[in-house]
């Protein structure tokens, strides 16, 4: 029944780092309003790949967007969240920095906002109002991309430093200051989006989801100026924060999840069943009840960089498998493996490959199976 289905406002805080959420007073206020999941593995730590995985519930090999240069490759036979919602009575809209980064399937309204010239603090609330009005009582889905972190990264980093310029990597302290400043802007923006829901009087039937597609490096890894070159925690560990009338408040989970879990979760929250088999699993019950959220046994991530020592924009060549404690990274082009104990070495500094840990062979076998599926 359409009248019982919630509105969904899906807000991408593009490039946000899990470990810097605390520096925004506004975002910390929002955290108290809902449930934060802060250990969700990005399937591809760059926007094109990441959002297609999120909105299809399928990895890149299956959905067709498995490389930087395959942005338009979404397969027609793959379920696409806005289209599924539209077919089930939703009015849908989106506001992106570039309309070409995502398939038009299933969207009633598509807006493109110039990241250098337009104020998203104004434009996005206006789009929510327009969507609500044009929905005419139907439930609505709005996907918003807050791109300020991306804008600053491109302007202050990519346009100033080549990937092998040591000046950038030797300036991590200032890089972090730059990042923190723009993330505070993201927190202010997020609060404005929360406020517009209250202003419209729709908070009783609206689920707000603030999330990131990937993190942003500040020079931790030589060869990665921002994201997409490797699969370390600063770029693949992401968060999703759910706020809604039935969502638990002031709740947090560090359980290991995957980006492929988001698609079935949103459909569950909207009470829309799908018959197609999904690699992910819904955690909607955890969001709305006292049930425990179990760790995924393993999660997977992959990338192929535009720049850097292992550039491969056509197809992924860096892969990783992650458990609740360990991560194994495979650099395919140079046939190099790196194993990290995330509990004792959260910054992934010491490669413990070859220390005869039983988990090493299990992770290697599972990762190769996933790559060659």
Where are these regions (language model features)?
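Catalytic domains that recognize anionic headgroups
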Residues: 1-373
């Amino acid at each position: 029944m359409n009248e019982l289905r919630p509105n969904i406002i899906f807000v991408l805080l593009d490039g946000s780092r899990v470990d810097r959420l605390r520096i925004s007073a506004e975002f910390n206020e929002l955290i108290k309003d809902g449930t934060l999941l802060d250990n969700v593995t990005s399937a591809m730590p760059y926007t094109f790949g990441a959002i297609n995985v999120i909105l299809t519930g399928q990895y890149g090999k299956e959905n067709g967007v498995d490389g930087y240069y395959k942005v338009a490759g979404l397969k027609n036979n793959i379920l696409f969240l806005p289209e599924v919602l539209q077919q089930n009575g939703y009015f849908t809209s989106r506001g992106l920095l570039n309309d070409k980064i995502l398939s038009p399937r299933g969207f009633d309204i598509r807006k493109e906002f110039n990241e250098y010239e337009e104020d998203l603090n104004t434009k996005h609330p206006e789009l929510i109002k327009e969507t609500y009005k044009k929905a005419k009582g139907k439930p609505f889905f709005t996907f918003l991309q807050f791109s300020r972190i991306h804008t600053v990264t491109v302007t202050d980093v990519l346009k100033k430093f080549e990937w092998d310029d040591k000046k950038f990597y030797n300036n991590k302290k200032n890089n972090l200051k730059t990042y923190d400043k723009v993330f505070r802007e993201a927190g202010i923006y997020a609060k404005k989006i929360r406020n517009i829901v209250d202003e419209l009087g729709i908070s009783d039937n609206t689920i707000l989801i603030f999330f990131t597609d990937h993190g942003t490096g500040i020079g931790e890894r030589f060869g990665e100026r921002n994201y997409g070159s490797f699969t370390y925690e600063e770029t693949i560990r992401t968060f999703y924060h759910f706020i809604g009338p039935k969502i638990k408040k002031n709740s947090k989970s560090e359980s290991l999840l995957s980006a492929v879990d988001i698609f079935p979760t949103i459909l569950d929250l909207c009470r829309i069943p799908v018959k197609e088999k999904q690699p992910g699993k819904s955690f909607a019950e955890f969001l709305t009840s006292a049930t425990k959220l179990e760790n995924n046994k393993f999660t997977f991530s992959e990338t192929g960089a535009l720049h850097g020592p292992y550039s491969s924009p056509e197809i992924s060549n860096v892969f990783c498998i992650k458990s609740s404690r360990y991560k194994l990274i495979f650099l395919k082009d140079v046939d190099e493996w790196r194993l990290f104990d995330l509990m004792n070495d959260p910054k992934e500094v010491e490669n413990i490959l070859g220390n005869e840990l039983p988990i090493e062979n299990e992770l290697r076998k599972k990762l190769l199976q996933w790559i060659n599926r």
